[in-house]
Amino acid sequence: MSDAEVPPAARGQAALLGPAEVRALAEEFGVRPTKQLGQNFVHDANTVRRIVATAGVGREDTVLEVGPGLGSLTLALLDVVDRVIAVEIDPNLAARLPVTVADRAPDLADRLTVVGADAMRVKPSEIPGEPTALVANLPYNVAVPVLLHLFSELPSLRTALVMVQAEVADRLAASPGSKIYGVPSVKANFFGAVRRAGAVGRAVFWPVPKVESGLVRIDRYAEPPWPVDDENRRRVFAVIDAAFAQRRKTLRAALGGWAGSPAEAERRLLEAGIPPSSRGETLDAAAFVRLAATHP
């Protein structure tokens, strides 16, 4: 038998999932995708290979995967990285994932650790080791909160490549001045450089979602241009939230509640070198950091 005829699992590689395998596993495990958990399972091997390649992860990486589901992306990651830590909120899927990996990638099974937890609330103490990269098909209904939470809680994360709803991907990667630039854009940029990294069609999912998907890459700043400790992050995020809560108003008016009064907001804006007549959508992350650092 030639190498081409030997099943991938027998060669120490993962046997990736296709449409038939995904449906068979779902039936075997009694899994019915739920909108509540934002579950849409990828069933295309080429798509998961592309995600892993775009993430740029390798043997030196410990990858954090959120919402591994039936294991499509997990198997592709195990082929190329040192370790995968999969965080799964669904207890049934969390229990079944090691079984799938043992069956389809027996030589790679020891690289997988499954954590049964809510990624939006998971604590560093629950994550074994220090993950260097986040690679995930994030549940669309909580994608941004999960992304920001993990970058806040896990300073070891150097990069992220996530699949999210296309509209969310556009907002995360938007630049100041854009109509879609907003809270997700600025907060993501607080941690690192953000860019769109590709598009993913609906046909590669089961069940087929009603929306298109997109890939977003975030590379954490190697040398942060501002303090990224929890206290400063909370201060900066509070200003961002206030500025966009009344998007159409000038910052002098929009930040009146945050600063105590419109007059005090104007004083602090001027101290930060920002025209009081500006609007939040024109400010980059650096401007919000300067504003948060002004003194009442």
UniProtKB/Swiss-Prot annotation:
Group of enzyme by EC: transferase
Protein name: Ribosomal RNA small subunit methyltransferase A
CDD domains reported for this sequence: AdoMet_MTases (cd02440)
Alphabetized UniProt keyword annotations: Cytoplasm, Methyltransferase, RNA-binding, rRNA processing, S-adenosyl-L-methionine, Transferase
Pfam families: RrnaAD
Originating organism: Rhodococcus opacus (strain B4)
One Gene Ontology MF term: 16S rRNA (adenine(1518)-N(6)/adenine(1519)-N(6))-dimethyltransferase activity
Protein family: Belongs to the class I-like SAM-binding methyltransferase superfamily. rRNA adenine N(6)-methyltransferase family. RsmA subfamily.
Position of the signal peptide: none
Binding site for S-adenosyl-L-methionine: 40, 42, 67, 88, 118, 137
Role, per record: Specifically dimethylates two adjacent adenosines (A1518 and A1519) in the loop of a conserved hairpin near the 3'-end of 16S rRNA in the 30S particle. May play a critical role in biogenesis of 30S subunits.
Enzyme Commission numbers on file: 2.1.1.182
SUPFAM superfamilies cross-referenced by the UniProt entry: S-adenosyl-L-methionine-dependent methyltransferases
